[in-house]
Structure formats: structure tokens, C-alpha cells
Amino acid sequence: MAGAVISLGLSAQSNGLTDTSRSRHAVMSNTPLGAVKWTGGFWGERFNVYSGTSLQSMWDTWNNPDVSHGFRNFEIAAGTCPGEHWGPPFHDGDMYKWLEAVAAVYAVNKDPELDALMNKFIGQVVKAQREDGYIHTPVIIDERNRGIDTHAFHKDQTVIGTKVGAEDEKGAFANRLNFETYNLGHLMMAGIVHKRATGKTTLFDAAVKATDFLCHFYETASAELARNAICPSHYMGVVEMYRETHNPRYLDLANNLINIRGLVENGTDDNQDRIPFRDQYNAMGHAVRANYLYAGVADLYAETGEEQLMKNLTSIWNDIVTRKMYITGACGALYDGTSPDGTCYEPDSIQKVHQSYGRPYQLPNSTAHNETCANIGNMLFNWRMLESTGDARYADIVETALYNSVLSGVSLDGKRYFYTNPLRMSDNLPYTLRWPKTREEYISCFCCPPNTLRTICEAQNYAYTVNDSTLWCNLYGDSELRTSLGKKRPLAVTQHTGYPYDGKVVLKFVETPKKEDITLNLRVPSWCDKATVSVNGKPEAVSVTPDSYISLRRVWKPGDEVVFDMDMRTRLLESNPLVEETRNHVAVKRGPIVYCLESIDIEDGKSIDDVLIPADAAFTEKDITIDGSRMTALETMARLADNGDWTGKLYREVGSADKSVRVTLIPYYAWGNRDKAEMSVWLPLSR
């Protein structure tokens, strides 16, 4: 469908998380913020925890200057209190992500306390912002402490022409690694979501000023200075600002940002700018930066329809999904490494990469980095590809990442976090990894927690999409949708299901356009090869193809009921044999949920290293509760290897595995929520 010109019409949706209602190269659009509400079930429980406990505990963290200067930095920059900047340069963006989450929750519950909380933060942002639209608290605080009036143009303000310097230089864009454009991108998205959720423009006006500043900056900066695209959230932000304002200058900026990448001298694979983007066909470098870039380019494609961009994105997507993505939807295998792309037997061209994609099929488990932000970036990229193509395989990746490698980043009680998401945790590693093995309330690099919070608090906005005559069901969960397919064409639907642990989904039309054919598209997940559909109790003859949509078109009436029942069986999965770390291993998956084994769920206190899964293993479903959260566990009999003592040994003769042991596997997203334990997704296969 690449290159097709599709008009959603002026009557299609707007005010969604993203607004592609006027995008000529998108086939669907988000429902408006607040149009979908979780009414119970899996996502109702998760939303209640994260919109309550997580949101408040994170605000408490931001407000404790002994722990984090997240909010205090804005107060100092605004002149509300004295002090120095403290913390990483990307903290501003992290706070904007938190605010976006609050706005998304407010769109659902209209809680006046949340409105007041947002007003408090926004007031400091507006006061801190420079007259020219620039805002980056490290620089603003430094200027204020030097007596510069940030609300008047001043000759000592560093705006354009600053030399690129060392990392300790504080001027605007003095250091390309200072995450200024990353922060501004999240300001844009927060301002847009806040406006769409509340109708207010206080933060949005600040975002407009910031976008105008970026336009001026990139129009006048030197090529060296223009290389400011670390973790480019601003690509998505600028395109969404164009959609909200219809200012063509913003779309020109978005396109220029892609062009500038091809002009960088001495670029790096780690930052995806060693070669022009239009020459890139494989995923490379820092996985968060990469996925944010791909998402932003997908946004640009939806507006311009440039065929070359879709060729790049499709090739990169195939590279990720078929050679570089974990079974959990996670991305970024390497903590540190050397780029496989930037060298060919030339030592001088060897480049360092970090938190990055590796070589094809390089997917270690114990040392997997898999930063939560990268996994969220994978969601953002695939969501935008779905909007432009309507291809269900993109929605499938959104679901896989969301249920597994995104939810795994936060504890079930919503208070503790992982930065990395490995697929194996062992106490026997003879080295120390950079990040802790247990969930922490606060980690020094606090970018993932607010990103996870906003993603989960916005998940209801991924459930349905529409155009003038079609309703897509993308994510299944107990929910209520109240929207319109255009002016005075109301549509209301309820959904009841035990998903993701039960494959039966019941959709009921509550309000429909009169005497008008509407297409209902039900997504068939990649794992589903058998399902039935009935309408008002009568079976429908449908073709069930994994990674597709089942289309039902008719004049729907209030009271019509659709039952979509997917056969949800437990499956043993193997990896491509080129993935060395998982050769002759299996993973267990049921529906969209990837399972893992924690050592505390092995009878007799045996080690994970001793457990093998029989090829004919029979699994019994078991309802359990961990830390107040209900879920389905899987119980089976495994084989038990006689591993004995490996002290001082690297190799030895193969031992026996003639004993059995009962094991219970839990959803991967739930690991690390009980006592400290070893964990593994992949387990040796016993044939």
C-alpha cells in the first residue's frame, strides 16, 4: 500500500494520540483522547495501578530534591527558587513524558486534582522558557545565575553560532549530546496531548514557541551545529505539531531534519548518521535513537508519501523483526560493542556503539540490554507503520512489545522499575552488569519509568482506529468506545473479554450510524491459526489468516453482538538456528504472552540450569496472583539434569537427565516481583 493516496476526509477522527485524520498517506486515524475507557479486565487493572500509584509515586520522586531535581530544575530555571542544575541533561524530557501521561489519564477521568497538578508544572515551564522559545533547564539555569534576563533577548544568550564544544560546556547546543532536541520533542508531544485532553493551550503555546525556535535554528545554523539529533523524539513531535497547526513550515522542518542527517561529517552508526537515511536499509546503532528515528520518518511518510522513505522503513522493519528482535518484542541487544556496519578490515573505521542493535541474529539473553525505552520505540515505530498501511503485522508487534518487554519494565505494584529487560537472570555470572538485577524505585537514568508510565496510561488509545466507514479492533480488552465516524455519525461499542488469557472477545454495538454500511475489522494475531466468528449467534464463514484482519461489513444496529473466539493454546517456540544462544532451546508462549521460569517456581529448590523442557510437554493453566495482580501461570513436568558441581571446569562429559520435576512458568512481564530469583525465558529442549 506504500505510495497510495488515501483521504480520511475532514469528518474523520482528530484529537487522538496521533492525528492522521488529514494525512493523505494514512489509512486510519486514532480515536479521540478519552473516547476509549478500560472497563475492567487486564488493562483495567493495569491502568488503575499506573494511573494512580505510579503517577503519584513518580511525582513524589520528582519533588524530592534529595533524590531527583526533575521538578526542582524547572523551579530554578523559572526563578521560583535559587540553585544549580542537577541531574542528567535529558531530565526535562522525562518530566514532559510524565506530564503527557497525566494528560492522558485526565482525558479519561477528568480528575480536577490532575488538572491542578498539570497547571502547577506548566506554570514553571512557561516561566522558564526563553523569549525566543528555547528551553533547556541546564542552560537556562546557567544564564539566570549569570544575571541574564531569559525573558528578553540578550546578547549573552547562546542561540545561534555557538561553537560545538566539550561535554561540560553549558551554552545552547554547545554539546550535541545534551539532548536538547530530545527534550523539545517531548515538550511538543506533551503540549499536544495536554491540549487535546483539556482544551487548554498553556503548554501547547510553549511547544509552538519551541518549534518555531527549532525552525529558525535549523534554517540558520552551521552544518556542524545542525547535527543535533540525539534520540530524535523531535521528529515525531515536529510532524505532530504540523498536524495540529497545519503550519507548512513545520513539515518543511521535518523533511529538512532527514536531509541534514545526510550532510553530517564523521557521523556514526550509533547515531544513525554515518550515511544518509535514504541509504539505510538495516537497523543500526543505539536502539532508542534508531526506533525514535524510524517512528519520526514513518510520521513524515504519512504526510508526504515519499516512496523512498517507505522503502527504507520496510527494509529496516524486516531486518528488525526477522533478524534482530527478541521474542518479547525487545530491541537493542548490546550494552556496548563495535558497529558491524562501519568497518571492513579497516581499524580506523571501527566505531563504538552502545545500547544498540548488533549483528543479525546476535541476541544474547543474560547480557541483553533491551532498554525499556527502545521497546517503547519499537511500539511507536510499528504503530505509525500501521496507520499508514493498515497491515495487521505492525499491530502484532505493538501488542507483543506492550504485553511483554514494556510491561516488564515496571513492577506489578507500579513503584519499581527495570532499565534493561534481559531474557535470563543468573546468579552465576562471573562479572557484574551495569544495571541492578532487581527492580528499583529510582534509577540514575530515569528515562524509562516515565516513558513506561505514559505508554501504559495511553494504551487504550491503541485499542481502536477508524476512518469514515471502518472500525479496526487492534488491541483486545474490556473497554467502552464512544466516538464518531464523522459529524453526527455516532458510534459506540462495548467489548468484554478475558484476553490476554482467554481468546473469546464479545463486541456489542450500542450506537451506530443509521442505514449505513460500516466495516468492522477484527485483528487476527500472528499466533492465531484457528478462530470462529458469530454475529447475533449465527456463525460467519470467515477465513482465518494469522497477521490479518477479518472484515465484517453491513449495516450495524444497536444491540448487534459479535463474538470472536480465538483458539488460545500453549506453544513451544524455537528460534532460527543462527541465533547461537538459543539453539536447541525453547520458549513458551500462550496467546500474546511470553512465559519465563523463575527458580522459586522449581520444586525442591533446583537451579534453572538443571531444567529441560520435553518436546511433548503438556501444560496446565493455573490462575495465580502475584502482588495483587491476577494472571494465568502454566504448570508442567520438566526433565531434571544432573549437573553436579562445575567448579573449576569448562567442559565435561554429558550427564544424565532421567529425573522429573514440576515447574510453574509465569508471564515474563511479572518476573522479579517476588523474592530474588534466577529467571530464564529460553530453556533447553529435551527430545
Region roles according to the model:
Residues 2-3, 13-94, 119-161:
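Low-complexity, Ser/Thr/Pro/Gly-enriched N-terminal "stalk/linker" regions
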Residues 15, 65, 313, 396-404, ...:
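C-terminal beta-rich recognition modules with glycine/proline-rich loops and embedded aromatic residues
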Residues 26, 78-95, 111, 148-150, ...:
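Solvent-exposed loop and edge beta-strand segments that line ligand/cofactor-binding
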Residues 41-45, 49, 99-112, 185-200, ...:
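Well-ordered alpha-helical scaffold segments within catalytic/enzyme domains
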Residues 78-88, 105-232, 236-268:
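Extended ligand-binding groove/face enriched in aromatic
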Residues 302-323, 363-415:
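Catalytic-core region of carbohydrate-active enzymes that cleave or remodel glycosidic bonds
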Residues 515-536:
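Beta-strand-rich binding/interaction modules
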Residues 532-561, 570-576:
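A surface-exposed beta-strand-loop module
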